[in-house]
A protein has these predicted regions:
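Beta-strand-centric surfaces of beta-sandwich/beta-rich domains
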Residues: 2-109, 116-243
Length: 243
Protein backbone atom coordinates (compact mmCIF):
# COMPACT_ATOMS: atom_id res chain seq x y z
CA UNK A 1 0.00 0.00 0.00
CA UNK A 2 1.29 3.44 -0.87
CA UNK A 3 0.97 6.19 1.73
CA UNK A 4 2.45 8.96 -0.41
CA UNK A 5 0.74 12.34 -0.09
CA UNK A 6 -1.15 11.43 3.07
CA UNK A 7 -0.67 13.32 6.32
CA UNK A 8 0.75 11.27 9.18
CA UNK A 9 0.54 12.71 12.69
CA UNK A 10 3.20 10.34 14.00
CA UNK A 11 6.81 11.37 13.23
CA UNK A 12 5.66 14.39 11.25
CA UNK A 13 9.16 15.70 10.57
CA UNK A 14 10.39 12.37 9.22
CA UNK A 15 7.38 11.98 6.98
CA UNK A 16 7.85 15.47 5.55
CA UNK A 17 11.38 14.45 4.57
CA UNK A 18 9.98 11.25 3.06
CA UNK A 19 7.54 13.27 0.92
CA UNK A 20 4.55 11.68 2.64
CA UNK A 21 2.91 14.88 3.89
CA UNK A 22 0.70 16.47 1.28
CA UNK A 23 1.70 20.02 0.40
CA UNK A 24 4.72 20.19 2.73
CA UNK A 25 8.40 20.43 1.73
CA UNK A 26 11.40 20.91 4.02
CA UNK A 27 14.44 22.93 3.03
CA UNK A 28 17.78 23.10 4.80
CA UNK A 29 19.77 26.22 3.93
CA UNK A 30 23.40 26.49 4.98
CA UNK A 31 26.14 28.96 4.22
CA UNK A 32 29.70 29.90 5.05
CA UNK A 33 31.91 32.89 4.49
CA UNK A 34 35.53 31.75 4.01
CA UNK A 35 37.14 34.68 5.82
CA UNK A 36 35.31 37.81 6.91
CA UNK A 37 37.36 40.87 7.85
CA UNK A 38 37.14 42.81 11.11
CA UNK A 39 34.37 45.42 11.43
CA UNK A 40 32.51 44.43 8.29
CA UNK A 41 28.90 43.50 7.62
CA UNK A 42 28.37 40.81 5.01
CA UNK A 43 25.96 38.09 3.94
CA UNK A 44 26.90 34.54 4.81
CA UNK A 45 27.77 33.18 1.37
CA UNK A 46 30.77 32.08 -0.67
CA UNK A 47 31.96 35.59 -1.56
CA UNK A 48 33.53 37.09 1.60
CA UNK A 49 33.02 40.64 2.85
CA UNK A 50 30.08 41.37 0.55
CA UNK A 51 26.34 41.76 0.88
CA UNK A 52 24.37 39.53 -1.45
CA UNK A 53 23.54 41.52 -4.64
CA UNK A 54 19.75 41.28 -4.58
CA UNK A 55 19.46 44.24 -6.97
CA UNK A 56 20.84 42.03 -9.74
CA UNK A 57 17.41 40.38 -9.77
CA UNK A 58 15.27 43.49 -10.11
CA UNK A 59 14.32 41.84 -13.39
CA UNK A 60 14.49 38.18 -14.36
CA UNK A 61 17.32 37.10 -16.63
CA UNK A 62 19.68 34.35 -17.70
CA UNK A 63 22.85 33.29 -15.92
CA UNK A 64 26.37 32.99 -17.31
CA UNK A 65 28.71 30.28 -15.99
CA UNK A 66 32.50 30.50 -15.89
CA UNK A 67 35.26 28.31 -14.47
CA UNK A 68 38.72 29.09 -13.11
CA UNK A 69 40.33 25.69 -13.72
CA UNK A 70 40.31 23.73 -16.99
CA UNK A 71 39.95 20.49 -15.01
CA UNK A 72 36.30 21.39 -14.45
CA UNK A 73 35.55 21.28 -18.20
CA UNK A 74 32.48 19.17 -18.99
CA UNK A 75 31.15 18.97 -15.44
CA UNK A 76 27.47 19.74 -14.96
CA UNK A 77 26.10 22.18 -12.38
CA UNK A 78 22.42 22.40 -11.46
CA UNK A 79 21.05 25.80 -10.41
CA UNK A 80 17.87 26.08 -8.33
CA UNK A 81 15.79 29.24 -8.07
CA UNK A 82 12.55 30.98 -9.01
CA UNK A 83 11.13 32.31 -12.27
CA UNK A 84 9.54 35.70 -12.87
CA UNK A 85 6.30 34.46 -11.26
CA UNK A 86 8.23 33.17 -8.23
CA UNK A 87 7.69 29.52 -9.16
CA UNK A 88 10.42 26.93 -8.55
CA UNK A 89 12.70 26.29 -11.53
CA UNK A 90 16.10 24.78 -12.23
CA UNK A 91 18.65 24.69 -15.04
CA UNK A 92 21.68 22.50 -15.75
CA UNK A 93 24.92 24.03 -17.08
CA UNK A 94 27.66 22.00 -18.78
CA UNK A 95 30.86 23.85 -17.93
CA UNK A 96 33.40 24.69 -20.61
CA UNK A 97 37.11 25.50 -20.47
CA UNK A 98 36.87 27.32 -23.80
CA UNK A 99 34.74 30.16 -22.43
CA UNK A 100 31.63 31.10 -20.51
CA UNK A 101 28.31 29.29 -20.91
CA UNK A 102 25.09 31.30 -21.15
CA UNK A 103 21.86 29.74 -19.89
CA UNK A 104 18.41 29.85 -21.44
CA UNK A 105 16.19 30.03 -18.34
CA UNK A 106 15.26 33.44 -16.91
CA UNK A 107 15.77 33.50 -13.13
CA UNK A 108 14.11 35.99 -10.78
CA UNK A 109 15.95 34.47 -7.80
CA UNK A 110 18.68 31.85 -7.29
CA UNK A 111 19.53 30.18 -4.00
CA UNK A 112 21.48 26.98 -4.67
CA UNK A 113 23.95 25.46 -7.14
CA UNK A 114 25.66 22.07 -7.05
CA UNK A 115 27.53 19.62 -9.25
CA UNK A 116 25.52 16.66 -10.54
CA UNK A 117 28.25 14.98 -12.61
CA UNK A 118 32.00 14.56 -12.52
CA UNK A 119 34.32 14.91 -9.55
CA UNK A 120 34.15 17.77 -7.06
CA UNK A 121 35.21 21.04 -8.65
CA UNK A 122 38.96 21.68 -8.74
CA UNK A 123 38.64 25.45 -9.12
CA UNK A 124 36.12 28.14 -8.36
CA UNK A 125 32.91 28.17 -10.43
CA UNK A 126 31.08 31.48 -10.80
CA UNK A 127 27.65 32.41 -12.12
CA UNK A 128 26.85 35.98 -13.09
CA UNK A 129 23.71 37.84 -14.09
CA UNK A 130 24.14 41.07 -15.98
CA UNK A 131 27.83 41.04 -15.08
CA UNK A 132 27.21 40.65 -11.32
CA UNK A 133 28.30 37.48 -9.54
CA UNK A 134 25.22 35.90 -7.92
CA UNK A 135 26.45 32.35 -7.26
CA UNK A 136 29.85 30.94 -6.43
CA UNK A 137 30.98 27.37 -5.83
CA UNK A 138 34.25 27.49 -3.92
CA UNK A 139 36.98 25.09 -5.06
CA UNK A 140 36.60 21.63 -3.57
CA UNK A 141 33.05 22.05 -2.23
CA UNK A 142 30.81 20.97 -5.13
CA UNK A 143 27.99 23.10 -3.72
CA UNK A 144 27.16 26.74 -3.03
CA UNK A 145 27.24 27.79 0.63
CA UNK A 146 24.54 30.46 0.88
CA UNK A 147 22.49 31.31 3.97
CA UNK A 148 19.91 33.04 1.80
CA UNK A 149 16.53 31.90 0.51
CA UNK A 150 13.40 33.15 -1.26
CA UNK A 151 9.95 31.68 -0.52
CA UNK A 152 8.17 30.49 -3.70
CA UNK A 153 4.74 31.71 -4.80
CA UNK A 154 1.83 29.85 -3.23
CA UNK A 155 3.82 28.75 -0.17
CA UNK A 156 4.29 29.98 3.37
CA UNK A 157 7.67 29.23 4.89
CA UNK A 158 7.82 28.29 8.58
CA UNK A 159 11.19 28.86 10.18
CA UNK A 160 11.97 26.08 12.68
CA UNK A 161 15.63 26.26 13.61
CA UNK A 162 18.71 28.44 13.18
CA UNK A 163 22.40 27.86 13.95
CA UNK A 164 25.64 29.78 13.48
CA UNK A 165 29.30 29.20 14.29
CA UNK A 166 32.58 31.10 14.26
CA UNK A 167 36.18 30.09 13.88
CA UNK A 168 38.06 29.91 17.19
CA UNK A 169 38.84 33.44 18.35
CA UNK A 170 36.34 35.10 15.99
CA UNK A 171 33.11 36.79 17.04
CA UNK A 172 30.19 38.60 15.42
CA UNK A 173 26.66 39.87 15.77
CA UNK A 174 24.23 38.07 13.49
CA UNK A 175 21.05 39.27 11.83
CA UNK A 176 18.48 37.36 9.82
CA UNK A 177 17.13 40.00 7.48
CA UNK A 178 13.77 39.41 5.80
CA UNK A 179 12.13 41.31 2.97
CA UNK A 180 8.49 40.35 3.45
CA UNK A 181 6.48 39.73 0.28
CA UNK A 182 9.31 41.45 -1.60
CA UNK A 183 7.49 44.76 -1.08
CA UNK A 184 9.73 47.60 -2.20
CA UNK A 185 13.41 47.16 -1.42
CA UNK A 186 13.35 47.17 2.38
CA UNK A 187 14.91 44.38 4.41
CA UNK A 188 14.30 44.38 8.16
CA UNK A 189 15.66 42.28 10.99
CA UNK A 190 13.54 39.21 11.69
CA UNK A 191 15.92 37.61 14.20
CA UNK A 192 19.25 38.48 15.77
CA UNK A 193 21.96 36.62 17.67
CA UNK A 194 25.55 36.64 18.91
CA UNK A 195 28.19 34.12 17.87
CA UNK A 196 31.76 33.48 18.95
CA UNK A 197 34.37 30.80 18.50
CA UNK A 198 33.80 29.57 22.04
CA UNK A 199 30.22 28.39 21.47
CA UNK A 200 27.85 27.64 18.57
CA UNK A 201 24.63 29.62 18.38
CA UNK A 202 21.72 27.13 18.32
CA UNK A 203 18.10 28.29 18.47
CA UNK A 204 14.87 26.32 18.03
CA UNK A 205 11.79 28.49 17.73
CA UNK A 206 9.10 27.68 20.30
CA UNK A 207 6.58 28.34 17.55
CA UNK A 208 7.58 28.08 13.87
CA UNK A 209 7.86 31.61 12.49
CA UNK A 210 5.75 32.22 9.33
CA UNK A 211 7.35 33.92 6.35
CA UNK A 212 4.93 34.63 3.47
CA UNK A 213 5.36 33.87 -0.19
CA UNK A 214 7.73 35.99 -2.28
CA UNK A 215 9.83 36.92 0.75
CA UNK A 216 13.64 37.04 0.76
CA UNK A 217 15.82 35.82 3.65
CA UNK A 218 19.42 37.00 4.05
CA UNK A 219 21.58 36.02 7.06
CA UNK A 220 24.28 38.65 7.69
CA UNK A 221 27.10 38.98 10.20
CA UNK A 222 28.82 42.05 11.58
CA UNK A 223 32.28 41.12 12.83
CA UNK A 224 33.80 42.75 15.89
CA UNK A 225 37.30 42.31 17.32
CA UNK A 226 38.42 39.29 15.32
CA UNK A 227 37.94 38.07 11.78
CA UNK A 228 37.67 34.47 10.57
CA UNK A 229 35.45 31.86 8.98
CA UNK A 230 31.75 31.93 9.89
CA UNK A 231 28.83 29.62 9.13
CA UNK A 232 25.05 29.93 9.39
CA UNK A 233 22.15 27.61 8.63
CA UNK A 234 18.39 27.43 9.04
CA UNK A 235 15.59 24.92 8.51
CA UNK A 236 12.36 26.04 6.89
CA UNK A 237 9.14 24.14 6.17
CA UNK A 238 7.25 25.17 3.03
CA UNK A 239 3.48 24.66 3.15
CA UNK A 240 1.40 24.86 -0.03
CA UNK A 241 -1.36 27.35 0.75
CA UNK A 242 -3.48 26.22 -2.21
CA UNK A 243 -4.24 22.81 -0.69
Amino acid sequence: MSFKNYIWDEQFDLNVSRNKVRGAVQYHKFGATPSQSINTTASVWDKPNTLYPWSAFNTAGVLVAGIANASDNGKIVRIEGLDNDWNLIQEDFTLSSSGTVTGTVAFKRVFRGYLISGDTNVGQISFTKGGTEVLRITAGTGQTLMAIYSVPAGYTGYLYHGVASAQTGADATGFMYVRFNSIGTTFRVGHTFEVSGSQMYNYKFAFPQPIPEKSDIDVRLTTRSNNGRFTAAFDILLVDEEL
